[in-house]
UniProtKB/Swiss-Prot annotation:
A lipid is attached at residue 353 (S-palmitoyl cysteine). Belongs to the G-protein coupled receptor 1 family. It comes from the Eukaryota. The lineage of its organism: Eukaryota, Metazoa, Chordata, Craniata, Vertebrata. Phosphorylated. Differentially phosphorylated in basal and agonist-induced conditions. Agonist-mediated phosphorylation modulates receptor internalization. Phosphorylated by GRK2 in a agonist-dependent manner. Phosphorylation at Tyr-168 requires receptor activation, is dependent on non-receptor protein tyrosine kinase Src and results in a decrease in agonist efficacy by reducing G-protein coupling efficiency. Phosphorylated on tyrosine residues; the phosphorylation is involved in agonist-induced G-protein-independent receptor down-regulation. GO terms for biological process: adenylate cyclase-inhibiting G protein-coupled acetylcholine receptor signaling pathway; adenylate cyclase-inhibiting G protein-coupled receptor signaling pathway; G protein-coupled opioid receptor signaling pathway; negative regulation of cytosolic calcium ion concentration; negative regulation of nitric oxide biosynthetic process; negative regulation of Wnt protein secretion; phospholipase C-activating G protein-coupled receptor signaling pathway; positive regulation of ERK1 and ERK2 cascade. This is Mu-type opioid receptor. Its main location: membrane. It is a multi-pass membrane protein. Keywords: Cell membrane, Cell projection, Disulfide bond, Endosome, G-protein coupled receptor, Glycoprotein, Lipoprotein, Membrane, Palmitate, Phosphoprotein, Receptor, Transducer, Transmembrane, Transmembrane helix, Ubl conjugation.
Length: 400
């Protein structure tokens, strides 16, 4: 997300009193879109920079490990992109493919996987952007990439917040959960989360644009005057509504759930149901905890840079990119967590990767049952054909 749109009135990039307006962009997008909360997507000090030399050069000394940083970032982004896209699409596939996976919790997981898949799909653009030190993809893709990052940030945390409330209802109010926790309601809530996220995603899409700066093209956000006010207001709003408030809601929900689980030995009257309930609750808790761990550094970093001037050093640049990479890494971790923490996901992943004869037979029978429901006349024909084949086999079978 373009963290640092360049103010229109910035005139002297050597002015020590205004370093935030001239500091080099953090790479693939400071909040890039992670980077868009603190910088544009283009890094004038990237590996292909033009070092003007002298005190007025916006780049650090030539000896800085920009090429090593670029290679490391591209390698990390490539891994996150491949694992994230494959893993999240696999999660969505098994939820759509297997009827037993269409539970309320898994519908929320589908929404989370969709947001993560969209976010990881932007990484190739960001890698090229950082390597070239300019944004070569045009204004339309600039708008799409930046808005996807904001959509992912808000939709992911809203979905995790919804999952925590859903777990709270399942554990603390099991009777009410029977009416509320349905796949249909979960789909409606998912749509609402995307609509609410549009409150920030759509404005950001209109604000995103490309600008020429120092011989390169930046993919950045533009703000009205005074620029510093609207830019910092955006950062603070994102920090509050996409991090602080959801984390507080999640903390309260899990605090109440822990008290409930400690005070009651059996929640549903069945040991098996209780075991599944606790297992799912534990899985959601781990997913939420990993999300908070991965996203806390970038949120803290951005809010500090909005309030305090941080000198541009190699350590600052490396730590900034580490925070960005950590945020994107979360998008590829969730499928791994599901595979280790949920037996149903683990079984479905195994059947997808290594199909067994029994699994293939189950899939074929499921297709036949679906065709039976959709085409009754065809189903009757299939039944007659099967009956004729059975008679033929009986007639041609060797005598004992």
């Amino acid at each position: 997300m373009d963290s640092s749109a360049v103010p229109a009135n910035a005139s002297n990039c050597t002015d020590p009193l205004a370093p935030s307006t001239c500091s080099p962009a953090p790479g693939p997008g400071s909040w890039v879109n992670l980077s868009h909360l603190d910088g544009n997507l283009s890094d004038p000090c990237g590996p292909n920079r033009t070092d003007l030399g002298g005190s007025d050069s916006p780049c650090p000394p030539t000896g800085s490990p920009s090429m090593i940083t670029a290679i490391t970032i591209m390698a990390l982004y490539s891994i996150v992109c491949v694992v994230g896209l494959f893993g999240n699409f696999l999660v969505m596939y098994v939820i759509v493919r297997y009827t037993k996976m269409k539970t309320a919790t898994n519908i929320y997981i589908f929404n989370l996987a969709l947001a993560d898949a969209l976010a990881t799909s932007t990484l190739p653009f960001q890698s090229v952007n950082y390597l070239m030190g300019t944004w070569p993809f045009g204004t339309i893709l600039c708008k799409i990439v930046i808005s996807i990052d904001y959509y992912n940030m808000f939709t992911s945390i809203f979905t995790l917040c919804t999952m925590s409330v859903d777990r709270y209802i399942a554990v603390c109010h099991p009777v009410k959960a029977l009416d509320f926790r349905t796949p249909r309601n979960a789909k409606i809530v998912n749509v609402c989360n995307w609509i609410i996220s549009s409150a920030i995603g759509l404005p950001v899409m209109f604000m995103a644009t490309t600008k020429y700066r120092q011989g390169s093209i930046d993919c950045t956000l533009t703000f009205s005057h005074p620029t510093w006010y609207w830019e910092n207001l955006l950062k603070i709003c994102v920090f509050i509504f996409a991090f602080i408030m959801p984390v507080l809601i999640i903390t309260v929900c899990y605090g109440l759930m822990i008290l409930r689980l400690k005070s009651v030995r059996m929640l549903s009257g069945s040991k098996e149901k209780d075991r599944n309930l606790r297992r799912i609750t534990r899985m959601v808790l781990v997913v939420v905890a990993v999300f908070i761990v991965c996203w806390t550094p970038i949120h803290i970093y951005v809010i500090i840079k909005a309030l305090v001037t941080i000198p541009e050093t190699t350590f600052q640049t490396v730590s900034w990119h580490f925070c960005i990479a950590l945020g994107y890494t979360n998008s590829c971790l969730n499928p791994v967590l599901y595979a280790f923490l949920d037996e149903n996901f683990k079984r479905c992943f195994r059947e997808f990767c290594i199909p067994t004869p029994s699994a293939i037979e189950q899939q074929n029978s499921a297709r036949i049952r679906q065709n039976t429901r959709d085409h009754p006349s065809t189903a009757n024909t299939v039944d007659r054909t099967n009956h004729q084949l059975e008679n033929l086999e009986a007639e041609t079978a060797p005598l004992p």
